Every structure is written in C-alpha cells, then in structure tokens.
Amino acid sequence: LVGSEMCIRDSEVSGYSEPSESEHDFFVIGHTSTSVSLASGLAKARDLKGETGNVIAVIGDGSLSGGEAFEGLNVGAELGTNFIVIVNDNQMSIAENHGGLYRNLQQLRETEGQAPCNYFKAMGYDYLYVKDGNDVEQLIEAFREVKDKKHPVVVHINTLKGKGYKLAEEQKERFHYSVPFDLETGNLTGEPGKGEDYADLTAGYLLQEMKKDPTVVGLSLIHISEPTRRRGIS
C-alpha cells in the first residue's frame, strides 16, 4: 500500500464526512462511490417519517463504476418519491474509466442525452441531460425542472474539470488535489520535507522487488502519486 503525499494533521478538518465535526455529516464515509446508496437511505427515512424535501446525491462519472454506486441506483429507482441523482460527468478518473457504462455515457454526451440506449432510464429513472454543466444558468434551469418531481430522476451534467483555470484544464490529474502552489505558474510553494517520504520509500522498494521477481504486484489504496511514478510501478 502506497501512502498519499497529503497527510491530515490532528488539528485539521478530516478529508471526508465526519459526524463528530459537523451536524451536517450524517455518516463516516471513505473515498468514493458512496453518495447514491447513502442518499437512498436518507430518502427512505424521510418517506417513513412523512417528511418532505429534496434528497440529492452527487456522484462523478469516475465513481459510478464502484459496486456501491450500482447498489444505490438499484434501490433508489424503486423509491417512487423525490430522489435526485446528479451525475457530474467530466470524463476524468485517476484510473482511466473502462466498460459498458462509460460507452453509454459517451453515447449520451454525443447525442445530448437522446441516445436510444440509456442506462439510467433502463433502471427506471427519469433522465435530464445538461449540455454545459459549467454554465450556472443551465444548472439552475435543470434543478428547477426536477426539484418537485415525485419520483427518482438522474440529472446528467457534462462538465470540464478545472474549467476557468488553464493549468487545471490542461493537467487534470496534477490539479485533482494539490498542496499549496503558485496560481500563475502552478509550481508548488513552501519548503518540501527533507528526505524521502513514505510514498518514495515504498515505490523504491517495490521497484527493487519487481526487478528480482516479475510476479510481484503493487496494490494502492487510491493511486500512486504522480502519473510517472505510477506507470513506473504498474
């Protein structure tokens, strides 16, 4: 397991949802693919209590391949009440997306949501496509259209990752997260730590072992730092 370069200190806010930090965090969750299943549970609880209001799950296209996302979509489709799933489709994932779902997302983008094959409709959701998800006015119009629906709906928004910041548009993975950097150049600021970090040490060890034994496989919890280092290990 290769560690991340970004370590959270005890005095800082945690990277994910944490109920002990905020009354608005209902669950302790991990990295990805959790939003739809959690939201479907919240929507069911709302209905059982006879309450009203919108329950909205936001998920990126990269997270849709997770098994928990499929389970959540499956359950949510049968709710029969207001349940909104927003798919932020920016065609970017740290590990490149592959599979039938992503072929269908591409078909939907290319036809502006009109493709005869529609994964979400097949599951029982209403479906609304937003051509430019970086256009705030288009988003407002779409959300107004779906907020009072009495059954599950998917809002599929096509977005550009890093929109408005040229460096982030061109280097999507580099700016997926970052330590402090210079806004003009993109160069990292601050003094780097002395010596090798955990990721460097682990990567170096794995490379040595792989040279001796081609059957060695490296497993990463999320991703292995910069793309060049990751390709060197994979």
Positions of the model-derived regions?
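Accessory "access/gating" subregions that flank catalytic or transport cores
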Residues: 201-214, 219-220
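Active-site-proximal gating segment of KS-fold condensing enzymes and close homologs
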Residues: 4-5, 9-17, 23
